[in-house]
From Swiss-Prot:
Catalyzed reactions: a ubiquinone + n Na(+)(in) + NADH + H(+) = a ubiquinol + n Na(+)(out) + NAD(+)
Domain FAD-binding FR-type, residue spans: 136-286
CDD domains the record matches: fer2, NADH_quinone_reductase
Molecular-function GO term, any one: oxidoreductase activity, acting on NAD(P)H, quinone or similar compound as acceptor
The protein's name in its UniProt record: Na(+)-translocating NADH-quinone reductase subunit F
EC annotation from Swiss-Prot or TrEMBL: 7.2.1.1
UniProt organism field: Chlamydia felis (strain Fe/C-56)
Function: NQR complex catalyzes the reduction of ubiquinone-1 to ubiquinol by two successive reactions, coupled with the transport of Na(+) ions from the cytoplasm to the periplasm. The first step is catalyzed by NqrF, which accepts electrons from NADH and reduces ubiquinone-1 to ubisemiquinone by a one-electron transfer pathway.
Subunit structure comment from the entry: Composed of six subunits; NqrA, NqrB, NqrC, NqrD, NqrE and NqrF.
Length: 431
């Protein structure tokens, strides 16, 4: 009976501990309500009274504008890394933060330029906002499918109203709004093929509770490049990678949260409603006859597909187009069949797949692990297979999108070959 008594004591102690924790949490929340006085603040935009918004104090300027129907772009989700949520505060600007000083010149800071994601609304402000952001809109869409196309990447397919099409351009992006939610990663198996389960099980990624049920309205928005091209409307597509915590002993760190936006998207099922806003973007196609080289890795597949399918299937471009796509293994490769068909149908399109870590089954199926143009890091394979053979590499346009290390390696490589930065179109959300 001794061990039963001990177990009983532990259970009672655990219950008491949980109750105390709940009481303390409640006290903290109530204290915040009482101590932090919330008051209305007016945001006057472009000196136009009709655009004035009244918001509650205490929130970020970015979330206040988003809640007011002004979809300021924030591709990084408000982490101050993309530097795209810039707003000019002509009256009422507080002292700049270090993130502002790292973004703007001294003169710009004096003029009132700030990152809206880092600016707290505490009083009335007069703002200058670009017209293109004021003209951005929001759409409600219905999830058609949300299947994994790689172990940690989903293809989110959404249908929007054909009566109100989204006027986006290839290379553009939309922001996805994230409501309060709670999810269990085991439920994600519903939209994940069994072939991807083993890696998730190996890293103990299933049965993880992600609780963002107290998420503040308008506080979470993340921009994602469109994988679709305009002719595919009213359907839009995204390739989205899950942001897991770092792994410790083959398990996600319990002290670091999962990505708020990507976890929400991974939880979506067919029939669910989502809200997108935009369109935004700077990494559009340069309309000239220069040959094109796409250097794409991982979930950068969105950016590459949107441009390439639009050029070939919609615009019937005769420009020379080469795609180098890097993945770990064939299981992680995205849109292979689609690109192989395009290569057969269009003599001006050339497709190169590079694997950095081919699996045993890949090699058994015929993948050449000894060919450095096929089994390598993408930037090295590209240099061996094409770049080093170009007589005038500066004559090409390079469209680059992928993980941070991929992007930095490509930029350094192209710089070594004398390619001007103006010839490189980088889609980088500051991840």
């Amino acid at each position: 009976m001794t061990w039963l008594s001990g177990l009983y004591f532990i259970s009672i102690a655990s219950l008491v501990f949980c109750v105390i924790g709940l009481i303390l949490s409640g006290v903290i929340l109530i204290s915040r309500k009482l101590l932090v006085k919330i008051h209305p603040c007016k945001l006057k935009i472009n000196n136009d009274d009709s655009l004035t918004k009244t918001v509650d104090s205490g929130h970020s300027l970015l979330s206040s504008l988003l809640d007011s129907g002004i979809p300021i772009p924030s591709p990084c989700g408000g982490k101050a890394t993309c530097k795209q949520c810039k707003v000019k505060i002509v009256k009422g600007a507080d002292q700049p933060l270090e993130t502002d000083r790292a973004t703007f010149s001294k003169r710009q800071l004096e003029q009132g330029w700030r990152l809206s994601c880092q600016t707290k609304v505490q009083h009335d402000m007069n703002l200058e906002i670009e017209e293109r952001y004021l003209n951005a809109s929001s759409w409600e869409g219905t999830v058609v499918s949300n299947d994994n196309v790689a172990t940690f990447i989903k293809e989110l397919v959404v249908s929007v109203s054909p009566e109100h099409p989204i006027p986006f351009k290839p290379g553009g992006y939309l922001q996805i709004s994230v409501p309060a939610y709670k999810t269990n990663t085991s439920d994600w198996k519903q939209t994940m093929a069994p072939e991807y389960h083993s890696d998730w099980e190996r890293f103990n990624l299933f049965n993880q509770i992600i609780d963002n049920s107290l998420l503040e309205s308008g506080s979470a928005n993340k921009a994602y490049s469109l994988a679709s091209y305009p002719a595919e409307l009213p359907v839009i597509k995204f390739n989205i990678r899950i942001a897991t915590p770092p792994f410790i002993n083959n398990a996600p760190s319990p002290n670091i949260p999962w990505g708020v936006c990507s976890s929400y998207i991974f939880s979506l099922k067919p029939g669910d409603k989502i809200t997108v806003s935009g369109p935004y973007g700077e990494s559009f196609m340069k309309e000239n006859n220069r040959p094109l080289i796409f250097l794409i890795g991982g979930a950068g597949s969105s950016f590459g597909r949107s441009h390439i399918l639009d050029l070939l299937l919609d615009k019937h471009s005769t420009r020379d187009i080469t795609l180098w796509y890097g993945a770990r293994s064939l299981k992680e490769n995205i849109y292979q069949e689609e690109y192989e068909k395009l290569e057969k149908d269009f003599p001006n399109f050339h497709y190169h797949l590079v694997l950095s870590e081919p699996l045993a089954e890949d090699i058994a199926s015929g993948w050449d692990k000894n060919d450095p143009e096929k089994t390598n890091f993408l930037f090295r394979a590209f240099e061996l297979g094409q770049l080093s053979k170009l007589s005038n590499p500066e004559d090409y346009l390079y469209y680059v999108c992928g993980p941070p290390l991929h992007n930095s390696s490509i930029l350094k490589l192209l710089d070594n070959y004398g390619v001007e930065r103006s010839s490189i179109i980088l889609d980088d959300f500051g991840n």
